[in-house]
Amino acid sequence: QRRLGDIETAMATMTFAGRFSEGGGSNVSQRLNLAVWQTGILQPRQALETANGIGDNLSPYGEAVQQWVRFAAYRQLGDLARAEQAKAWLQAHDDVAAGYFMEALLEDNALDAAAAHLIGRLQSTQHRSDTLLSVQRFVTVPSLPGDAERDRRWWQVVARRDVQAALNAVGRSDAYAIVARGSSR
């Protein structure tokens, strides 16, 4: 539905999907995805309500998504102290946060730090494959309003000379006429 440009219907579907049980319990993954989308459409209060309603018994990755939602939502609400707490958690757990610390750096417009972080991930044998995939250009859906500036900054960081030098040392970045799995990047 999002690929068809119908954000409202997509949100309604995600809300409905979040009501189903998952493995006998709360449908955590769908509810976290909904909370991320709520930050993307600039609904920070709803995003916090959704994310906090899940509870704290999450996988490490689930907790990372929850902390990302808190960071983004508190930033949108102007509560920078709470946003910084969530960002500190993302930084401390970057190995399991699957790029959410990078997203926080981009949201903060900390482009030098984002470039250094990206270079570090390119140089890491543990993170290189996922990082190389992240710098490829695919056919994507348009960015949600809350994601657009961060997405623009991402490509600005990828285009930097220092990042390109690190990238070219271990791989390459190219554009492909293949539809991406779901992200706006």
Where are these regions (language model features)?
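"A position-specific structural signal for the A-helix of alpha-solenoid helical repeats
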Residues: 32-33, 67-69, 76, 99-100, ...
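Solenoidal tandem-repeat scaffolds enriched in leucines and small polar residues
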Residues: 1-13, 17
